[in-house]
């Protein structure tokens, strides 16, 4: 992994990429009127820091690469964040290929395995992108099929153990989850097993936003905090109090994987966030309910983007179209 000093020059580009991903999440869910905006938005900084800092070794052109690190979305219902991230990064590759004609920008398995923004129009529709994480087709980036909170914890540890037993313990498994998923029994068993098995190639990222689907914050009903839990289980823990601070976030990752690296000890990094960041509906209210299609709140999230980058959305402020076909056309205009 590169040091925060080396990465500092890229933070301005990460910020732009983050904003593009946010827009993709919003437009995709605005069209489909289904999905999870709050946890998706709150994890974008963590996703980009993991993928672009060198913390995770991966190749977007070859998601099945044998010795690349693995990614498990523990709670698979936050996959709009992953879909949007892949769409933005793949669009950058598509632009570079169109500019240069160089094949190094192409997916090694062909376009049918490259998730692009057009695929976001198919969320939760037959033959389109599934509502939960599935390791197939254009979403081979996922390394396990997951759905509810905590679901991916045991598989993530199992993959880390398998890699160790195969003699490639330097291949890491990154597991993404919000702290709500830490309440499941399977997660507690995973934390115990990972420590006992010395899975230092398992890296848990916890999006610490204090809310799930209920109105009560987790801190009011669960004793202790995420860092308390992992520390008590013997894990090496690093974190930052503001996931929007790229410098502090990358420093925490660098301390975890490089400066303070511990052998045979599983790792956890946390970043405090706001569920629904930038969505104008926060905490539990943002969990699984997108804004009404083309509502005032939806357009408010677009206004932030237009003001920041001096761009305009086609028919800004327009109401939703009457037919599904015309609604899809509207979404295409918003993406382009």
Ranges and model annotations:
Residues 18-34, 207:
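N-terminal capping segment at the start of a domain
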Residues 4, 20-21, 154:
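Extended, solvent-exposed polar beta/coil surface segments
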Residues 37, 41:
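Gly/serine-rich nucleotide phosphate-binding loop at the start of the catalytic core
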Residues 14, 25, 31, 42-197:
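Cofactor-binding active-site loop characterized by glycine-rich and histidine/acidic residues
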Residues 1-15:
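Non-catalytic, mobile gating and regulatory segments of ester bond hydrolases
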Residues 15-18, 336:
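Non-catalytic terminal/interface segments that mediate subunit docking, oligomerization
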Residues 137-331, 335:
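Glycine-rich ThDP/TPP pyrophosphate-binding loop and its adjacent helix/strand module
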Residues 26, 32-36, 54, 61, ...:
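Conserved, well-structured beta-alpha core segment at the onset of a catalytic domain
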């Amino acid at each position: 992994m590169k040091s925060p000093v080396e990465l500092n020059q890229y933070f301005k580009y990460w910020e732009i990429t983050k904003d593009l991903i946010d827009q993709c999440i919003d437009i995709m869910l605005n069209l489909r009127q289904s999905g999870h905006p709050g946890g998706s938005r709150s994890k974008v900084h963590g996703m980009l820091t993991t993928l672009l800092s060198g913390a995770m070794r991966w190749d977007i052109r070859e998601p099945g690469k044998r010795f690349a690190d693995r990614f498990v979305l523990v709670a698979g219902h936050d996959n709009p964040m992953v879909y949007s991230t892949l769409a933005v990064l793949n669009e950058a590759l598509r632009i570079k290929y169109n500019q240069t004609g160089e094949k190094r920008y192409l997916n090694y398995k062909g376009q049918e395995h490259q998730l692009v923004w057009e695929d976001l129009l198919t969320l939760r529709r037959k033959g389109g992108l599934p509502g939960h994480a599935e390791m197939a087709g254009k979403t081979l980036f996922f390394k396990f099929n997951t759905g509810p909170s905590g679901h991916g914890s045991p598989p993530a540890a199992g993959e880390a153990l398998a890699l160790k037993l195969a003699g490639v313990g330097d291949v890491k498994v990154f597991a993404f989850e919000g702290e709500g998923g830490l309440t499941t029994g399977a997660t507690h068993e995973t934390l115990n097993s990972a420590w006992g098995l010395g899975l230092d190639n398992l890296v848990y990222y916890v999006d610490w936003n204090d809310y799930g689907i209920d109105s009560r914050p987790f801190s009011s009903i669960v004793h202790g905090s995420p860092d308390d839990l992992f520390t008590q289980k013997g894990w090496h823990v690093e974190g930052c109090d503001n996931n929007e601070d790229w410098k502090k976030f990358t420093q925490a990752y660098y301390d975890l994987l490089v400066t303070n690296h511990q052998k045979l000890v599983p790792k956890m990094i946390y970043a405090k966030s706001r569920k629904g960041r930038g969505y104008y509906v926060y905490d539990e209210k943002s969990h699984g309910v997108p804004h009404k299609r083309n509502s005032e709140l939806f357009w408010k999230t677009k206004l932030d983007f237009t003001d920041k980058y001096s761009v305009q959305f086609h028919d800004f402020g327009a109401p939703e179209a009457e037919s599904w076909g015309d609604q899809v056309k509207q979404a295409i205009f918003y993406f382009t």
